[in-house]
């Protein structure tokens, strides 16, 4: 089942309640405004967010604070199969796509770095008490690194950059995500 939203409050609700998730589901968030997707261990700079009228919502994923910009593709994959490989397959397919487009991308743990230094794609995975695996994928299409520095509370070790700077579009990345998900019965 695939759910889409552009509203961060709806995204948080969907993730918290695992709406419609019986065995497996995909949530695609295409933010309509800048927002922060935080974790319990890595909050956003709430004072700065409030001063700018920006929202921050805690999701149940691992990893750090993600700043989502309009045009970005944020993916949540829920599964009761603890051995699912959605992140791994999606990462490999993204690497192949970027290389096909002539983009020099390297894998650095859970991140893909363009030009060996700019984070354009990141993943995290967490398991809930209910035996549900939540895999999160952040695909940066648009990015303002200075704004990310002001919103995130941890020191930035990898500078983010948007794939639009390399000529890659939201639609191309959405097509890739949906293709991998639709083919997932055969590869996961």
State where each predicted segment sits:
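N-terminal lobe of the biotin/lipoate ligase/transferase fold
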Residues: 1-85
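Short acidic-glycine loop/turn motifs at beta-strand connectors
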Residues: 32, 115-117, 128-130
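Short amphipathic alpha-helical segments
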Residues: 10, 82-90, 169-173
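Glycine- and Gly-Pro-enriched alpha-helical subdomains that act as flexible
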Residues: 111-114, 121
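Long, positively charged amphipathic alpha-helical accessory segments at protein N-termini or as interdomain linkers
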Residues: 93-106, 123-188
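Short, charged/polar, Gly/Pro-enriched secondary-structure boundary elements
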Residues: 44-45, 119-122
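Active-site scaffold segments
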Residues: 74, 113, 138-140
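Contiguous, small/hydrophobic- and glycine-enriched helical/loop subdomains that border
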Residues: 69-110
């Amino acid at each position: 089942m695939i759910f889409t939203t552009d509203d961060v409050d709806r995204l948080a609700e969907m993730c918290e309640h695992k709406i419609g998730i019986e065995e497996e589901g995909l949530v695609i968030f295409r933010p309509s405004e800048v927002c922060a997707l935080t974790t319990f261990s890595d909050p956003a700079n709430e004072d700065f967010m409030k001063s700018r009228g920006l929202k921050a919502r805690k999701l149940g994923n691992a990893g750090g604070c993600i700043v989502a910009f309009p045009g970005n593709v944020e993916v949540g994959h829920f599964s009761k199969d603890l051995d699912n490989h959605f992140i791994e397959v999606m990462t490999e397919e993204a690497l192949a796509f970027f290389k096909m487009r002539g983009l020099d991308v390297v894998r650095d743990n859970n991140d893909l770095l363009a030009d060996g230094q700019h984070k354009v794609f990141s993943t995290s995975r967490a398991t809930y008490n209910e035996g549900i695996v939540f895999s999160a994928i952040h695909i940066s299409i648009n990015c303002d690194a200075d704004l990310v520095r002001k919103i995130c509370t941890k020191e930035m070790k990898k500078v983010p950059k948007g794939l639009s700077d390399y000529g890659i579009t939201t639609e191309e990345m959405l097509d890739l995500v949906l293709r991998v998900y639709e083919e997932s019965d055969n590869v996961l």
